[in-house]
């Protein structure tokens, strides 16, 4: 049995979890509402303040989706209570970020500023060279952070570019030069 899948999910006060007949799990909380369709190989049982995920059978697919489904539901519960965030840092001369309403405007050395609209439910916080992406959906927060990082990935010689705050860039030595 999946070690992750068999752990029950604690549902905090102020959060409601509903499952309909099509295995669509809906979680409502103070930071919003999230829905996820769960595979038919697993079932979702709500027992008071806990949610348990069980397998229908012991097939290879059911075992594979058991832990995944439990993690997806647990992330939804965490998202509507605490939310998720990713922090990006910009290194480079003239690299800057500003907010224009809800839109993120990035100056990344191109001939034009790059405008990034937030995904549904996400929001941006900006310091001079730091961008924080916040939202209840872990997948959307991570996806938006990856797409922003992709605009100017960090390069190994000078370290210029956009990187995650906890990412370590492996630096390379420059040319050896003539002697």
Curated annotation (Swiss-Prot):
NCBIfam families: L6_bact. HAMAP family: Ribosomal_uL6_B. One of its GO terms (cellular component) is cytosolic large ribosomal subunit. It holds the Pfam family Ribosomal_L6. This protein binds to the 23S rRNA, and is important in its secondary structure. It is located near the subunit interface in the base of the L7/L12 stalk, and near the tRNA binding site of the peptidyltransferase center. It comes from Herpetosiphon aurantiacus (strain ATCC 23779 / DSM 785 / 114-95). Keywords: Ribonucleoprotein, Ribosomal protein, RNA-binding, rRNA-binding. This is Large ribosomal subunit protein uL6. GO terms for molecular function: rRNA binding; structural constituent of ribosome. One of its GO terms (biological process) is cytoplasmic translation. Part of the 50S ribosomal subunit. Belongs to the universal ribosomal protein uL6 family.
């Amino acid at each position: 049995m999946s070690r992750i899948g068999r752990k029950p999910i604690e549902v905090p006060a102020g959060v409601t979890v509903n499952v309909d007949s099509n295995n669509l799990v809906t979680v409502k909380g103070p930071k919003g509402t999230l829905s996820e369709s769960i595979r038919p190989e697993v079932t979702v049982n709500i027992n008071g303040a806990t949610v348990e995920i069980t397998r229908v059978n012991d097939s290879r697919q059911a075992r594979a989706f058991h832990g995944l489904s439990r993690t997806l539901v647990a992330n939804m519960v965490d998202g509507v209570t605490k939310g998720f965030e990713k922090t990006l840092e910009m290194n480079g001369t003239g690299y800057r970020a500003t907010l224009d309403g809800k839109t993120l405007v990035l100056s990344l050395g191109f001939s034009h500023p790059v405008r990034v609209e937030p995904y549904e439910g996400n929001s941006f916080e900006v310091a001079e060279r730091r961008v924080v992406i916040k939202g209840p959906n872990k997948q959307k927060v991570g996806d938006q952070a990856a797409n922003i990082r992709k605009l100017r990935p960090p390069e190994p010689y000078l370290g210029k570019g956009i990187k995650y705050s906890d990412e370590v860039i492996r630096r390379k030595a420059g040319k050896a030069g003539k002697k």
